[in-house]
C-alpha cells in the first residue's frame, strides 16, 4: 500500500488498480456460480507440463474455496502410450480408437488410476486436503457398452473399448456434499459383463457425468484456443455457438476436435446450461473462463439461450 502523500508509482499502482478491477469484475460471477457444479475435463498439454499442471491445480482449488463444486475428469493418452512402449506392448489406433487388448487394458487401468490420478490428487491436496480419487468402475459410476471402430466404411474390432451408456453419480454427489473435490479416471464397467472393464473416451465420459450431476458447466481443456470455423485461420475463432450450429459443423471438423465438440453438444442437449472448450496451454484459463465477462475459448449454448445471447 502506498503511504499517505507518497508519490504515485505508475507500475506499482496501476498493477494494483488492475488487480482491483479483476476482483470487481469477478464478483457477479462469484455470486452467480455459488454452489454450482462444474465438471472439468483435464487433458492435453496441461497434463505433461508441470507449470500448467500446477496452475490447473491452483484454479481448481480456487473454485472450491470460493463456493463452486468442481469435479475433475481426466484421461491419460500420452502416459498410456508411454507406458505401453516401455513394457513393449503393441499399441495401435484404428479409426481413431486405441486397440485395447486385455494386456493393454491392465496398463490403461494402472496408468489412469495409479499414476495420472494419483498425481492430480497429490497436487490438489498439497494446496488443501480436499481431493479424492475415483475410478469409473467405483460404485458403478460409469457403465459402458462395447463399440467397434469404422475403417474404410467397415466395422473393426478394437477390443476392450466402450461408450458410456449409464452413469450413477451418487458417489460423486456424496463427495461434493462432503466438500470434497472428486477426481475421476475414465474407465467403465462393461454392461454385458460386470467383471470386465472397458476403456472409454474421457471427453464423452465427462459430458455424461455433467448431465447426470445436473452441472452448471462442462469445461473441456484442449491444446487449441477453441473452435475455429475455418481452421487454420486463427481469426476464425468462434466465441459463441448454438447447439444446432455446432451440430451442422461437426462433419467438417478436424478429427481431434470431434469428440470434444460432441461432448459439449451432448452436454447442452442433456440439460447442462453451458459447455466450453478452452486452451489448456494458457495458465489459469479456467479462472478466466468462469470469472471474467469476456471468458475465453468457445462457449456452446442451447439454441434458445444462444439466440438470446447473440441479440444482447
Curated annotation (Swiss-Prot):
EC number: 2.7.2.8
Pathway the protein takes part in: Amino-acid biosynthesis; L-arginine biosynthesis; N(2)-acetyl-L-ornithine from L-glutamate: step 2/4
Protein name as catalogued: Acetylglutamate kinase
A GO BP annotation: arginine biosynthetic process via ornithine
Residues of the signal peptide: none
NCBIfam families: argB
Residues annotated to bind substrate: 76-77, 98, 199
Function: Catalyzes the ATP-dependent phosphorylation of N-acetyl-L-glutamate.
Record bears the keyword NAD: no
PANTHER family to which the protein is assigned, alphabetical: N-ACETYLGLUTAMATE SYNTHASE, N-ACETYLGLUTAMATE SYNTHASE, MITOCHONDRIAL
Site, as annotated: Transition state stabilizer: 41, 260
Catalytic activity: N-acetyl-L-glutamate + ATP = N-acetyl-L-glutamyl 5-phosphate + ADP
Entries under InterPro entries matching the protein: AceGlu_kinase-like_sf, AcgluKinase_fam, ArgB, Asp/Glu/Uridylate_kinase, Glu/AcGlu_kinase, NAGK-C
Superkingdom as given in the UniProt entry: Bacteria
UniProt keywords, alphabetically: Amino-acid biosynthesis, Arginine biosynthesis, ATP-binding, Cytoplasm, Kinase, Nucleotide-binding, Transferase
Localization terms from the record: Cytoplasm
Family of this protein: Belongs to the acetylglutamate kinase family. ArgB subfamily.
Source species of the chain: Beutenbergia cavernae (strain ATCC BAA-8 / DSM 12333 / CCUG 43141 / JCM 11478 / NBRC 16432 / NCIMB 13614 / HKI 0122)
This protein's GO CC annotations: cytoplasm
GO molecular-function terms, A-Z: acetylglutamate kinase activity; ATP binding
Gene3D superfamilies membership: Acetylglutamate kinase-like (3.40.1160.10)
Protein's gene: argB
Amino acid at each position: 500500500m502506498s503511504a499517505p502523500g507518497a508519490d504515485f508509482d505508475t507500475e506499482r499502482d496501476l498493477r494494483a488498480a488492475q488487480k482491483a478491477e479483476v476482483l470487481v469484475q469477478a464478483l457477479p460471477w462469484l455470486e452467480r456460480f455459488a454452489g454450482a457444479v462444474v465438471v472439468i475435463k483435464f487433458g492435453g498439454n496441461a497434463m505433461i507440463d508441470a507449470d500448467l499442471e500446477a496452475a490447473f491445480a491452483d484454479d481448481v482449488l480456487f473454485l472450491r474455496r470460493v463456493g463452486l463444486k468442481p469435479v475433475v475428469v481426466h484421461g491419460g493418452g500420452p502416459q498410456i502410450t508411454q507406458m505401453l512402449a516401455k513394457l513393449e506392448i503393441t499399441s495401435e489406433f484404428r479409426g481413431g480408437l486405441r486397440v485395447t487388448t486385455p494386456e493393454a487394458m491392465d496398463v490403461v487401468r494402472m496408468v489412469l488410476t495409479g499414476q495420472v490420478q494419483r498425481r492430480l490428487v497429490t497436487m490438489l491436496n498439497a494446496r488443501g486436503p480436499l481431493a479424492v480419487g475415483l475410478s469409473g468402475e467405483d460404485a458403478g459410476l460409469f457403465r459402458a457398452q462395447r463399440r467397434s471402430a469404422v475403417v474404410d466404411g467397415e466395422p473393426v474390432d478394437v477390443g476392450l473399448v466402450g461408450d458410456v451408456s449409464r452413469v450413477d453419480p451418487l458417489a460423486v454427489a456424496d463427495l461434493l456434499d462432503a466438500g470434497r473435490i472428486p477426481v475421476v479416471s475414465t474407465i467403465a464397467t462393461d454392461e454385458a459383463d460386470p467383471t470386465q472393464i472397458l476403456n472409454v473416451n474421457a471427453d464423452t465420459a465427462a459430458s455424461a457425468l455433467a448431465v447426470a450431476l445436473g452441472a452448471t458447466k462442462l469445461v473441456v481443456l484442449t491444446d487449441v484456443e477453441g473452435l475455429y470455423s475455418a481452421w487454420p485461420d486463427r481469426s476464425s475463432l468462434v466465441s459463441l455457438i448454438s447447439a444446432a450450429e455446432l451440430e451442422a459443423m461437426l462433419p467438417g471438423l478436424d478429427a481431434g476436435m470431434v469428440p470434444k465438440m460432441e461432448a459439449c453438444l451432448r452436454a447442452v442437449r442433456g440439460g447442462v446450461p453451458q459447455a466450453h472448450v478452452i486452451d489448456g496451454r494458457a495458465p489459469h484459463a479456467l479462472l478466466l473462463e468462469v470469472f471474467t465477462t469476456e471468458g475465453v475459448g468457445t462457449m456452446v449454448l442451447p439454441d434458445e439461450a444462444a439466440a438470446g445471447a447473440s441479440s444482447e
